[in-house]
Amino acid sequence: MAQKKYLQAKLTQFLREDRIQLWKPPYTKENKEVGLAVKDLAKKYSERLECCENEVENIIEEIRRKAIERGTGNEHYRTTGIATIEVFLPPRLRKHDKKSLLETRLHVTGRDLRCQIAETFGFQENYIKIVINKKQLQLGKSLEEQGVTHNVKAMVLELKQSEEDVRKNLQLEEEEQNEAELKERRIQRTKRGLEILAERAEMVVDPETMPYLDIANQTGRSLRIPPAERKALMLAMGYHEKGRAFLKRKEYGIALPCLLDADRYFCECKELLDTVDNYAVLQLDIVWCYFRLEQLECLDDAEKKLNLAQKCFKNCYGENHQRLVHIKGNCGKEKVLFLRLYLLQGIQNYHSGNGEEAREYLNKARQLFKELYIDPSKVHNLLQLGFTAQEARLGLRACDGNVDHAATHISNRREELAQIRKEEKEKRRRRLENVNTLRGMGYSTQAAKQALHQARGNLDDALKVLLSNPHMWWLQDADPENNSRQASPSQESINQLVYMGFDTVVAEAALRVFGGNVQLAAQTLAHHGGSLPPDLQFSGEDSSPTPSTSPSDSAGTSSASTDEDMETEAVNEILEDIPEHEEDYLDSTLEDEEVIIAEYLSYVESISSAAKNN
């Protein structure tokens, strides 16, 4: 298949260079049948490519037929408005490399298109996902709204792995339906779990009792990132980790939607993309996923993604990895990423008909593989010392295969990370204490968090921020119990403020604004010379009684408990796939890469062998 793709790409190049239009005479007759001139063309190009004339003729005929189909489709679209979509099916449903075309109007919804694809090609509608232009098709929006155009490519991802005789075996069909439902639920739980963890990252939680995710730099220390970008980055990295977990299990059809979601969220924090290598790794993972799904043809910008990854690595690691070496002391582990990059660049060039470029990249990948290959006995020696296989591989690559140096490196890194985690945990604990201190003074959790963020964690400065910005005190918590407001403050509270020297009317207004909180009202009035600041004076007019709990509220207890259980399940499922080792993305046995490098090098070698023989 790969060799045929190469020939197709080369012949397409030749046809463009020679400005040959196969859909016109003398290559196509009036009745659209093949003309005799195609044979002459096949002979000319087969000599140029040093390969079988008959094979070249067959591929030229395929290209000619596709060109005619495209021209017919274009004319049909101009006259009727009915668009043609090229559907790329899973490998088990492809028939002799024949194109699968579907006609539709572009005002229909994504759900309509999914239904049409399911009916046409024999899928169960709820168990497929459609990817167009590297985005999942949204069911509720029209195709036009989602940028779907005439002649677009649509890839079908099947959430169940059907057998050819699935319809003959009812028991097997039922099992596979259950499997598909399970996979769909997993995808939905992934989304919810990541949203919960991203929200917790913005909350002040006790790290001892509530799991949360954090974003760290290459040394393992937390990064200060603006809240809006932080949430987008958290979701991007979370989806990426989940996608990588599916990649490890070779569940490429489920991995791809996660990776594409990660790409979408990364694009919401573009200023950070050049400073972290995560985005570059994601581009590699997306191209790798398309390749393993045998759908590289659907990824029109594979070359662009790989170039983007290369540029991002250079920005993050520096010229010749100088910045990386300065931070980490070595770059041995990161070479795994460059091996994957060169391999994919080799594959992409081969599929594009660029044999020499493919050979160059594949040879670079092979050279890196030789450098990164690890003697199993050395891994065994480190296992005997109590290290994990992952630590052993990473340590040996960081230390050029020296076992003693690797053992020291791993031990030092363990100690360094333990210290960093201890410091980060203490920092989180102090922040929690500071928030609770401000809450004890009457401020909302949200106001306390924002003030501490502005004051870079300093409690005294945060208090000054709050006193200088009373409008912040109305930042509300999610918990309505923390947002109580009083229509009529108690006389006792009013008397307390009057006793402190404040005017009765002003005291009552302040208590209305601050929900009866005497301490907040007193602090505000004292800070502003005995009166409410203008931006808070209207609040007292709008105060309304806190709604009392109705009997129906208690009826939701069971439902809330169920929702909480589901959220816990979703979070736990995410946490299971978040690797404990911060350099997990750099760890690979390189077994798959070794096989694929050899396979594609054999393809490019066969090209040069044919050239020499001729």
From Swiss-Prot:
Coiled coil: 36-71, 151-206
Biased composition (Acidic residues): 562-590
Localization annotation: Nucleus
Region (NEDD8-binding 1): 426-473
Keyword Cytoplasm (UniProt): no
Inducing factors: By interferon.
Keyword Repeat: yes
Domain of life according to the entry: Eukaryota
InterPro entries: NUB1, NUB1_ubiquitin-like_dom, TPR-like_helical_dom_sf, UBA, UBA-like_sf, Ubiquitin-like_domsf
Ranges of Low complexity composition bias in the record: 539-561
An annotated GO cellular component: nucleolus
Residues covered by the UBA domain: 373-413, 423-469, 488-528
Motif mapping: Nuclear localization signal: 413-430
Stretch list, region NEDD8-binding 2: 549-597
Region named Disordered: 531-590
SUPFAM superfamilies registered for this protein in UniProt: TPR-like (SSF48452), UBA-like (SSF46934), Ubiquitin-like (SSF54236)
Assembly description: Directly interacts with NEDD8 and PSMD4/S5a, a member of the regulatory subunit of the 26S proteasome. Interacts with AIPL1. The interaction with UBD via UBA domains facilitates the linking of UBD-conjugated target protein to the proteasome complex and accelerates UBD degradation and that of its conjugates.
Identification of the protein by name: NEDD8 ultimate buster 1
Gene: Nub1
